[in-house]
């Protein structure tokens, strides 16, 4: 039932599933005109719901950004593109391959996409076509999304950043079936502006998530 959809979505997403939403694409009257009185009303997938592309407020954690990230490697440098589609904020950065794990731990992404067949990608990444992680394609997609002829007004982006941005936008286009969410101009993050912590350090400090016996006692929540 439609009124129970959010409850089922929550259970499926928490279980690691991706959900396809199908809806009627024509009225019963249009179906009759097309195929007579026994014609079935046409239905089609209108959206894919994934952990990193949730927009339903009831399914989002109010104190935590729901981050979708795309990662790739270009000429020995890893590019990272991250966004929260509920706010439209988009961040781009690059790092050496050995610091990719720490960068992803800092982001705490709900979902990560990476080029199919990339050996350095984390085990839980969603594989995507390698062709969507082209730096030239990423530059073109950013220009198209923001309706500009050049990206100079947004900052300086490396080829790795642009490739990751291309993969991110292509994935959003895929799950939205051609309808992109509102995205703000990308912001470049500098490595010197952050203290890097690996995943084990963040877990032991309980910065974002506490252990089960201390539910609701995360450091950031206690310090607000």
Language model: regions and residue ranges:
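Charged catalytic and DNA/RNA-contacting regions of genome-maintenance
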Residues: 1-217, 224
């Amino acid at each position: 039932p439609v009124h129970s959809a959010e409850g089922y979505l929550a259970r499926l997403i928490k279980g690691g599933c991706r959900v396809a939403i199908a809806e009627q694409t024509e009225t019963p009257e249009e179906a009759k005109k097309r195929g007579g009185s026994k014609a079935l009303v046409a239905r089609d997938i209108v959206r894919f719901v994934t952990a990193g592309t949730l927009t339903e407020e009831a399914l989002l954690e109010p104190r935590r950004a729901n981050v979708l990230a795309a990662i790739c490697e270009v000429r020995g440098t890893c590019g990272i593109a991250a966004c929260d589609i509920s706010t439209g904020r988009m961040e781009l950065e690059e790092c050496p391959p050995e610091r990719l794990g720490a960068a992803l731990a800092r982001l705490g992404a709900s979902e990560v996409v990476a080029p199919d067949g990339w050996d350095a990608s984390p085990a839980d990444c969603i594989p995507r076509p390698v062709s969507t992680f082209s730096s030239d394609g990423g530059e073109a997609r950013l220009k198209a999304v923001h309706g500009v002829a050049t990206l100079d007004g947004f900052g300086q982006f490396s080829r790795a950043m642009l490739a990751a941005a291309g993969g991110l936008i292509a994935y959003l286009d895929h799950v939205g079936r051609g309808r992109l969410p509102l995205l703000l101009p990308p912001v470049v993050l500098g490595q010197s502006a952050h203290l890097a912590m690996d995943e084990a350090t963040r877990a032991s400090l309980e910065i974002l998530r506490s252990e089960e016996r201390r539910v609701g006692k995360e450091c950031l929540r206690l310090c607000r």
